[in-house]
Amino acid sequence: MSIDSLKDKLPDFAKDVRLNLSNIANDDTLGEQTKYGLMLACAVATRNAEVLKAFDQECTPHLAPAARDAALAAATIMAMNNVYYRFVHLASNKAYGTLPAKLRMNIIGNPGVPKTDFELWSLAVSAINGCGMCIDSHEKVLLNADTTQDTIQTAVRFAAIIQSTAVALEAASLPVSAAS
């Protein structure tokens, strides 16, 4: 399965998603590893097996094994961090922010790819998972590393499109309405 096969499965009510999916597939504003690692990390974050399989097939040929592992690690570590830090951020009791997290996250310090790639992937996954504290943290690191706001916006746009693809496929699995 590929991105093209996903597009073929999207119903007419998701025409915009289909067109946006074509746009990111053809987007060349990011480097190859950055782009394909980003798409794979976001696909994992959707928690949709069909989306993950299609993006894995599409992305893996463009990624060294270490880069593929780093993309998978970005989605995985953010699944943990986004829950924890979203809680810390949203809890009325601010004392939680003063407590040690006690979460192992060594992969962030040594991801096996350039730090800016891993940070960009982590930011995009954090956008999917809705953790403002993590978004701010990763954005700060990226901006300090001279990553442009356009690059950050592109990553979040990719995340939004990949997430909407998963939702559209789930919506398309509903039975056809009797009124149709």
Swiss-Prot record:
Q: Which cysteines are joined by disulfide bonds?
A: 131-134
Which GO terms fall under biological process for this protein? cell redox homeostasis; response to oxidative stress
Taxonomic superkingdom: Bacteria
The record's active-site residues are 131, 134
Can you say what this protein is called? Alkyl hydroperoxide reductase AhpD
Gene Ontology molecular function terms on file? alkyl hydroperoxide reductase activity; disulfide oxidoreductase activity; hydroperoxide reductase activity; peroxiredoxin activity
This protein's encoding gene: ahpD
Q: Please give the catalytic activity noted in the UniProt record.
A: N(6)-[(R)-dihydrolipoyl]-L-lysyl-[lipoyl-carrier protein] + a hydroperoxide = N(6)-[(R)-lipoyl]-L-lysyl-[lipoyl-carrier protein] + an alcohol + H2O
Q: Give the protein's function.
A: Antioxidant protein with alkyl hydroperoxidase activity. Required for the reduction of the AhpC active site cysteine residues and for the regeneration of the AhpC enzyme activity.
Q: What is its EC number?
A: 1.11.1.28
Transmembrane helix among keywords: no
Gene3D superfamilies the UniProt entry points to = AhpD-like (1.20.1290.10)
A Pfam family it matches: CMD
Give the family per the record: Belongs to the AhpD family.
